[in-house]
Swiss-Prot record:
The lineage of its organism: Archaea, Methanobacteriati, Methanobacteriota, Stenosarchaea group, Halobacteria. The chain crosses the membrane at residues 19-36. InterPro entries: Bact_solute-bd_prot1, SBP. Part of the ABC transporter complex XacGHIJK involved in the uptake of xylose and arabinose. Belongs to the bacterial solute-binding protein 1 family. The complex is composed of two ATP-binding proteins (XacJ and XacK), two transmembrane proteins (XacH and XacI) and a solute-binding protein (XacG). The keyword Transmembrane applies. This is Xylose/arabinose-binding protein XacG. GO terms for cellular component: plasma membrane. It comes from Haloferax volcanii (strain ATCC 29605 / DSM 3757 / JCM 8879 / NBRC 14742 / NCIMB 2012 / VKM B-1768 / DS2).
Length: 459
């Protein structure tokens, strides 16, 4: 899951968390499975069953799929781009297994996690939980503290997921002595995608790009030797700068420097060095409309040949794959972000269940399915991510994802992403985004941004 919008905090999170605390203390009683009118959304589902139960008691539906008493309501942010085809495939696969279950899958808004998180927090604060919702695990779950269901016995232990999921994903799905989430897929973050025709025209050998300096030299060569913009960048929201800066920091100063930063021991000199390199890129080598476009528009510039390269998570592959005229190893190719060879920058999407669940048995059946081979293959192939199960046959994935899956299981280091909820708390992540949003969207104030980043992780 990835963010698309122009702002990173459109809700009063403190107000909602206060309400959550009150609700948790009161047992969050009296909730229902409705609430679809609280936000603009796109709904899908089979429409079977009762249309959602308002009974406060636990449901008694069979987890074998023989009978169900309540509607399964799932919120997600995959409203378009890389995610729409993936979640559609996931829903279709689930409904094939449970055709008699009444389901309601809602894509919330067009701004992915921002609107989604606002809706989830509002629903939980109003004692109106949904069955499940898509979200990042790890420290991101702190925003929902006190309102999460424990799936350990009914899902994790019952299905043996602790033995079949990658251990890092298992740990990320633990929170406050519970396991409220099941991972659905992983995106690799440290990617550099490029248009092969543009690189060939400029005389760039992608395999030679082994450092940030080498990348900068290549961007300058493209700028001088072609009419193509060297790099597509999307700055309609600050997370893209934060994400790219993290790759540069790791490339220049190593995984240890990045780890020290997210753990609250930043090396300011390393922070500044990475910002200087990012400033060079943003001032000289990106499209003129970068401040107003999303990553999907930026990715289209690489497809059309208007931009030579782009750094993004491999959700961009999901977008590339949807274009039959833009093929891997032909029109486009990939390398690890220069200087991060042997590293898998770790991102995880998961499905989370809230407590006082309005459809307990249906939710358990759904969460079990999310962790199954069938679900993980159906979802990840179109998404551009890879399954987190360790027993997947790579031949069931596309060639690019089979390669990524091998890297997922056999890399030297797995630093967690700072821009997508795993590495730091929501408060710290928000402060890091604000550091870029306030100081690094043009003009690019290195010193002020460095001060704000250091302060964000040092509090």
């Amino acid at each position: 899951m990835v963010e698309h919008d122009s702002s990173d905090e459109s809700v009063n999170r403190r107000k909602y968390l206060k309400a959550l605390t009150v609700g948790a203390a009161a047992g969050i009683a009296g909730c229902t499975g409705g609430g679809g009118t609280e936000t603009e959304s796109t709904e899908s589902g089979n429409g079977n069953g009762s249309g959602g139960s308002t009974d406060d008691t636990e449901t008694s539906g069979s987890s074998s799929g023989e009978s169900w008493d309540s509607q399964l309501e799932v919120l997600h942010g995959w409203a378009g781009g890389d995610g729409e085809a993936a979640v559609t495939a996931l829903i279709e696969a689930f409904e094939e297994e449970h055709p008699e279950m009444d389901t309601n899958f809602q894509a919330v808004g067009a701004s992915a996690n921002v609107n989604l998180n606002a809706t989830i927090l509002r629903r939980l604060a109003n004692n109106n939980p949904m069955s499940s919702f898509a979200n990042w695990p790890g420290k991101n779950l702190e925003r929902y503290s006190g309102a999460l269901m424990d799936l350990e016995a009914d899902v994790w232990d019952a299905e043996g997921f602790k033995d079949t999921m990658q251990s890092r994903a298992v740990e990320l799905c633990k929170f406050n002595d519970k396991m409220p989430a099941v991972p659905i897929g992983s995106h690799r973050m440290n990617n550099l995608f490029y248009n092969t025709a543009v690189f060939e025209e400029a005389g760039i050998d992608a395999s030679s790009l082994d450092s940030v300096d080498a990348l900068l030299d290549a961007l300058e060569t493209i700028d001088q030797n072609t009419d193509v913009t060297p790099m597509a960048q999307a700055m309609v929201a600050p997370w893209t700068n934060l994400q790219l800066w993290a790759q540069i920091l790791t490339s220049q100063s190593g995984v240890e420097a990045y780890t020290n930063f997210i753990e609250g021991n930043p090396d300011r000199a390393a922070v500044v060095e990475a910002l200087e390199a990012l400033k060079t890129i943003n001032e000289n080598y990106i499209t003129a409309d970068a401040s107003s476009i999303s990553f999907t528009t930026a990715g289209q510039k690489v497809i059309s040949g208007k931009a030579a390269t782009i750094h993004q998570g491999n959700w961009v592959y999901g977008m590339f794959r949807a274009d039959d005229s833009f093929n891997y190893k032909e029109q486009w190719d990939w390398i690890p972000f220069p200087g991060t060879e042997g590293i898998y920058f770790y991102h995880v999407d998961s499905i989370v269940a809230p407590s006082n669940n309005p459809s307990r048995e249906e939710t358990i059946a759904w969460q079990k399915f999310v962790g199954s081979k069938k679900a993980q293959i159906a979802f990840n192939n179109p998404k551009g991510s890879v399954p987190l199960r360790t027993d997947i046959d790579p031949s069931e994935l596309t060639d690019f994802l089979a390669m990524t899956y091998e890297d997922l299981t056999d890399s030297e280091a797995y630093p967690p992403t700072i821009a997508h909820g795993l590495a730091v708390t929501p408060k710290t992540m928000g402060a890091c985004k604000t550091a870029f949003g306030d100081n690094f969207m043009g003009p690019f104030n290195v010193e002020a941004t460095a001060d704000a980043l250091v302060a964000a992780v040092s509090e």
